[in-house]
Amino acid sequence: MAVLVGSAATQAMADDAPASAVVGSVAVVNDYLFRGLSQTNWKPAVQPGIEYDHASGWYVGAWGSNISWLSDASTDAAHISSSVELDFYTGYRGSFGSGVSYDVGIYEYYYPGSYPAGFTRPYTTEVYGSLGYKGVTLKYSHAFTNLFGFYDSKHSGYVDLSYNVEFSPGWTLNTHVGHQHVKHVAGASYSDWKVGVTKAFDHGYSVSLGYYDTNASRSVYTNADGHYIGRATGILTLSKAF
């Protein structure tokens, strides 16, 4: 499941990029969270991303990370080898000219590896749209496939409300609340939230520290190791934009 700790850095660079440019980032995090859930069983991740932004507003990009949530479920009888997430996306962003920005696109989450017979593949395709105004962004993502391996979960959706504001030169307050609706899967829907700060440095470096939590069901979101992946946690992110 794709992060938005790492991909947010790429997104921010894209917003500030000159006309028709290639931008990218690489981030290191102490735990990869996606929509509040640990994807690496509380272990570090390295997350590179690259994006091409056309002067017209069209863009295309790719992003990746190591993961463990799939291989953590592997058994001798049902072996799962996937340990990498590769994401591909394209879209169009612009402004209405009144300070209101918009962004629409399609996002593919891909997890290469081997899976046992009958295992619902985690590959997920979402379309998304967002509106932004003065640091506030409202985004909706809609899955046209099963959602990250949940059987019969097509047309699940995620609502994301965030507020990011620079409160001092180089310092940004980051807040977010979201809700994941998982269709046809009892107990799988949940909400998540965060509050954090980002410090920007010269030459594209930045450091972020955030507090994250969810109300995800322990019975649904406890992995094979007995770890509840929706617990409250702190995330440290070191990133470099280029």
Identify the function of each model-found stretch:
Residues 20, 42-46, 82-86, 100, ...:
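Residues that define the transmembrane beta-barrel architecture of outer-membrane proteins
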Residues 22, 56-62, 98-102, 135-140, ...:
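Repeated loop/turn-to-beta-strand initiation elements of outer-membrane beta-barrel proteins
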Residues 38, 58-121:
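Surface-exposed loop and membrane-interface regions of Gram-negative outer-membrane beta-barrel proteins
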Residues 51-57, 91-95, 130-136, 164-166, ...:
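Structural signature of outer-membrane beta-barrel channels/translocons
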Residues 195, 199-205, 227-242:
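Outer-membrane beta-barrel "beta-signal"
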